Amino acid sequence: PTRRSSDLVSTNKKENTQGGLSSYTHVKEDISIMLRTNADNTIEQHVFTTMFDFYALPSNFPGYNEAKEIENPYECIQHLEHSFSVAIEDKRFIPYFQLHEFEALLFCGIDSLVEKYPKCKKNCEQLTNVLQKFGNPELINSNPSTAPSKRIINAIEGGKKQLYKYNKPATAKAVTANIGIDVLRSKCPHFNEWIEKLIAK
């Protein structure tokens, strides 16, 4: 039988940082090292994937300029992921970009966000309105002032009197864990496709 385990590699290796990508060059170097140092055998079979935000993605990623010209968000991401896969050239590699950033997943369970910040229940109603407008969390746009994380921060910290200081990494982890992967998959088509690819491997 093959052994199952997983390793998570951060895009930012400095202590007390929230991640973020600086350059495709660094990403490719890290992936290339992992591919070379993890060979498949009869005991271990490896799958490599990414979870990068499309929002604020470095422009030197393969296919980036062409993808930006594609109006349909899903077709745009498909082009970007295909270009990334071609550049890496390894059948074990499954690229994934989050539309439009990780915080979009929190829109799958706004009630869970309210549980963490109960005094902002009224403010969080605007998040429900945003979700209804766009149809699903993955379509909430990536404008610097209206990206999912910016909308959430505004709901939690906005108002005449700031009641909370929004903790972005801790909240994202806690809320998505509370929502559960089944709900995330049911409400986010591209996220679900990624999970299905990983399961199929």
Locate the predicted segments by residue:
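C-terminal accessory helical subdomains adjacent to catalytic cores in phosphodiester-
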Residues: 7-15, 31-201
